[in-house]
């Protein structure tokens, strides 16, 4: 069988970001021999990563049998007995597939494009290949996902997780999900079974955390655990009920050319202009959603993992675009390290985040060539931590060492809080795991400002309590925030007396637009080393591209 090498069209955004980048050899120190990035290879600290290719060996080809209406299967699975009609044949094909082969999902003979499934498990060495035009839809029957606790599809005061993910990858090596098709979690579709059948969607349940303080029990889209060398390539992940991609103890993850979106046009309107009274903040059974009301739909969340690459990808969700976690459990403590994020575009998100769980350590993480278009969105009334650009967050209950973190060649616009470095993210009476941020570097960062928020609000807020001060160590070189003077977040949760506080700044010679608003303070442990100088701000004219030009069912 001949090799299928699909080379996606490189969008103007990625070409622009590739062109403006000042290349470094790797995401982590010590550097490997310098090898320049190209459109088909990325240099990392763990080696040169080549653009993935489509499989050459196919063990089974499965044809889609369902015809979606307007991108939805809701008219076809109203009966909960029909909620997972393709699960058995999909799982059987995966289980019977030998390593180094793929299960290939293709359109039906009459143009059918949909498959409907409950939870699936990917076998070690096996690739799930979803062809262009094909969508794998997740069930909207909570009983299909329940892990035995009986509360999947509800919102309760108990935070114990009760739903299996739609796709689970565990104890695998060299497995993958590839192809130009889609996986749709159907977060905005009305549930068909359980106590909320006919009255709420997954996202309606998630919004009860805002209105009633309850914990939603809903499935993640893709969970990858205890695995090595997993690949996501060219796939679109949409409308997850919760996080789209999460990992735990993964060594080697390449995500290349993926697109993540929540909500899509199936659950919204162009420009996210929902009709009055249709969203879950005012209607408990919503008919339209915005990013602000599709809660906890994080895009890409690598946790306790290393050798992670996300490149040439697009993310618009109702929460963090990327959220890196590093949390020690009772069984093990695994750092998040050696991660590289290059040539990516964010839209509506809560930004690029590290934390708040940092207690098992984070190190050697680089973000390069990132564009963030915040659309002047600010969900401050229901989530004061939304609308960020670059963020590192932790607190005294889940903190650890965070060091060697670099942000380079970053363009932003319409972002309320462009820079947030906060070691006092939450309050707690007992503080036994203290956060320490050091070796943080910002180089060539340019925010074009916001019509709604001007220059935006910043936080440089290191850890301080009655006994301990752990200052942030951060260097700035050519960091320009337009839109007028910036403001600084108010002091909070018993941290330093003012913001900036407990922060040691180093200026590397390039311009820093807010330098004149910084003042040294011995009592507040603010130090300024060096001075900014003249320089040319990073050119961001070509750094933003409409998402619908890349993914047609995007509302923006």
Regions found by a protein language model. Name each.
Residues 117, 144-167, 191-222, 239-243, ...:
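Extracellular beta-strand/beta-solenoid scaffold signature
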Residues 132-133, 173-182, 228-238, 251-265, ...:
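Right-handed parallel beta-helix
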């Amino acid at each position: 069988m001949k090799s299928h090498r699909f080379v996606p069209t490189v969008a103007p955004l990625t070409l622009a970001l590739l062109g403006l980048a000042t290349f470094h050899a790797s995401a982590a120190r010590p550097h490997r021999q310098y090898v320049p990035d190209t459109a088909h290879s990325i240099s990392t600290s763990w080696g040169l990563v080549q653009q993935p290719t489509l499989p050459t060996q196919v063990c089974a080809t499965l044809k889609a049998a369902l015809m979606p209406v307007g991108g939805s299967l809701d008219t076809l699975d109203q009966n909960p007995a029909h909620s997972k009609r393709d699960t058995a044949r999909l799982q059987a094909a995966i289980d019977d597939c030998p390593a180094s082969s793929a299960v290939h999902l293709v359109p039906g003979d009459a143009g059918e494009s949909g498959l409907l499934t409950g939870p699936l498990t990917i076998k070690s060495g096996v690739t799930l290949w979803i062809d262009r035009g094909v969508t794998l839809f997740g069930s909207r029957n909570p009983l299909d996902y329940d892990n035995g606790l009986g509360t999947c599809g509800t919102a309760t005061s108990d935070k114990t997780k009760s739903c299996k993910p739609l796709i689970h990858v565990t104890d695998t090596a060299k497995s993958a999900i590839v192809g130009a098709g889609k996986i749709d979690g159907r977060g905005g579709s009305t549930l068909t079974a359980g106590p909320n059948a006919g009255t709420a969607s997954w996202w309606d349940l998630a919004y009860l955390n805002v209105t009633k303080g309850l914990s939603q029990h809903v499935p993640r889209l893709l969970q990858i655990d205890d695995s090595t060398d997993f690949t996501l390539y060219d796939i679109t992940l949409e409308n997850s009920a919760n996080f789209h991609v999460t990992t735990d103890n993964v060594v080697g993850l390449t995500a290349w050319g993926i697109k993540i979106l929540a909500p899509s046009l199936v659950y919204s309107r162009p420009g996210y202009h929902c009709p009055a009274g249709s969203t879950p903040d005012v209607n408990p059974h919503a008919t339209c959603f915005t990013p602000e009301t599709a809660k906890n739909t994080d895009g890409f969340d690598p946790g306790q993992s290393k050798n992670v690459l996300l490149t040439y990808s697009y993310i618009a969700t109702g929460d963090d675009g990327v959220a890196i976690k590093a949390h020690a459990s009772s069984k093990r403590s695994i750092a998040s390290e050696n991660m590289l994020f290059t040539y990516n575009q964010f839209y509506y998100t809560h930004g690029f985040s590290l934390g708040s769980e940092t207690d098992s350590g984070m190190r050697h993480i680089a973000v390069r060539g990132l564009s963030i278009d915040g659309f002047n969105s600010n969900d401050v009334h229901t989530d004061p931590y939304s609308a960020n650009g670059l963020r590192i967050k932790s607190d005294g209950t889940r903190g650890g060492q965070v060091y060697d973190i670099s942000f380079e060649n970053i363009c932003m616009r319409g972002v309320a809080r462009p820079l947030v470095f906060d070691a006092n993210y939450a309050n707690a009476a007992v503080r036994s795991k203290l956060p320490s941020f050091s070796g943080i570097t910002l180089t060539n960062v340019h925010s074009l400002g916001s019509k709604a928020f001007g220059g935006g609000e910043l936080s440089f807020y290191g850890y301080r309590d009655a006994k301990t001060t752990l200052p942030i160590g951060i260097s700035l070189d050519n960091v320009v925030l337009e839109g007028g003077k910036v403001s600084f977040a108010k002091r909070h949760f018993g941290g330093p007396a003012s913001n900036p506080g407990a922060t040691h700044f180093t200026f590397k010679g390039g311009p820093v637009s807010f330098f004149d608003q910084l003042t040294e303070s011995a009592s507040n442990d603010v130090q300024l080393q060096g001075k900014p100088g003249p320089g040319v701000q990073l050119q961001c004219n070509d750094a933003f591209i409409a998402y619908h030009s890349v993914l047609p069912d995007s509302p923006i």
